[in-house]
Amino acid sequence: MFRDGAPDHPTDPAQPGESVQQAGERADRVLAYVSKVHQETHKDVVAVTHGHFSRVLIARFLKLPVSVGASFQMSTTGAAVLSYDHSCWEEPTLLGMFAPSLRPTAFLPSALDPKHEEYQYLDLVDEVIRCGEYRADRTGTGTRAIFAPQLSLEFDLTRGTLPLLTTKRVFELLWFISGKTDAKLLADRGVHIWDGNGSRDFLAQRGLGHRREGDLGPVYGFQWRHFGAQYVDADTDYTGQGVDQLANVIHAIKTNPTDRRILLTAWNPVDLSIMALPPCHILCQFFVSMREGQRPCLECQMYQRSCDLGLGVPFNIASYALLTHLIAAVTGCEASKFSLVLGDAHVYMDHIEPLKEQLKRAPRDFPKVHLKREVSNIDDIRPEDIDIQGYQPHGKIEMRMSV
C-alpha cells in the first residue's frame, strides 16, 4: 500500500530516501488510512511494503518510536511484489494483513512489550467503539455497548502501586468512607463529580424535589456504613444505625481472613427509588492470601453493573484500588491486586472522538501511594495523610458527563 509514495534515495537504492521523521509521519498516515477503511467497511486490509519502510511501519503499528524498527530482524527472501527501475532485491518485502479486530499490543515482541496494565482498559475502549451495538439510554445521549466483556481488568497493587488517573477521586473515596451523602462537601473541595446528580432539576426529575440541593439520598457511603437504616436527609446523624459493612469487612480481615463472606455492597433494592442515582459499582469482595512466611496480601474484586468507560471506569479503578490500600494499611496487610468485572460496558456517543484521542497516547507509569503516618482506624485517615508520588498525567481530554 504505497498510497503516499515510496521515496527513493537519489543515488543508492539500499538507503532510505527520507528522514526518520518523514518516514514515521508517512507510516502514521498509512495506518490512519487503514483505520479509516476499517471504520467504513469493517473488512480486512492487505498491506504491502518494501525496504526500510517495512521496519518503520511495524514500529509505528506497535506504537513504538521509529528508531526501534531498526532492531527488527526481517527475512530477505520475501516475494518480490514490487518492481521499479533500481529496486534492490536484497531488501526485505513485507506482505501483511490488518484486520479490524487487530490490536498492536497483542503482537508486541516480548522484549518490547511494555505490559502496561492500562492497555487492558484501552483495548476494551477500542473494542466497544468498533464493535459495540448502538443503544439508547436514560440520558438521551446514546451509547455503544457490549455486555460482560470476557476478561476482567486486573491491576497489580504491590509496592504501593496505584492505577490513578485523577487525584480528585481521593476526596470522593474518603467521602464514601465517612458515610456522608452531601455532594456539597465534595464541591467545597473542588470535586464536582456529583454536581449534576445533586442539582435541583435532577432531583426534581427523580421525584426527590423535596430534598435540598446536594442531598443525594442513601448512596454508596450510606450503604457502606448504615445499610438498612431509615434515610431522612443528608443532615441527619446516623451514628449507630444500620449495618456498618465497612467495619465488618475490616474486622473479618483481622480476625477471620479466610472467610468467604468479606463483602461490601451498595445495592439496596429498598432504597433505590430514593437515591439520586442507583449505584453503578455495586459489590466488592476481599480475599486475604496468607502464604507461609509472607505478609498477608489483600486482594479486591469489584463488580460494576453500569460501566461508563470514558468518565466512570478509570476513576472507579483508582477509587477501589485506593480503598484496598487503605484497608490493607489498617489491617496489617499489603495491598496485592484489584480486579474489575464489568456488566454493561459502554461508551457515550459524544465520548467517542475524545476517547480516540486517548487511544493515541502511550500509558505512563502508575504512581505510588503510601500513608504519611501510621493509622489503625480507617475513619481517622484524612486527605493530607495520603501521599501520592510519581503522578504524571497526560493533559486533560474534555468529556461531558451525561446525567
Predicted regions and their residues:
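Phosphate-handling substructures
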Residues: 1-29, 83, 98
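Short, active-site-adjacent cap segments at secondary-structure transitions
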Residues: 53-55, 348
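Generic beta-sheet signal
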Residues: 40-52, 262
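Hydrophobic packing residues within well-ordered alpha-helices of enzyme cores
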Residues: 57-58, 355
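Alpha-helical packing segments of well-folded alpha/beta enzyme cores
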Residues: 19, 23-34, 124, 169, ...
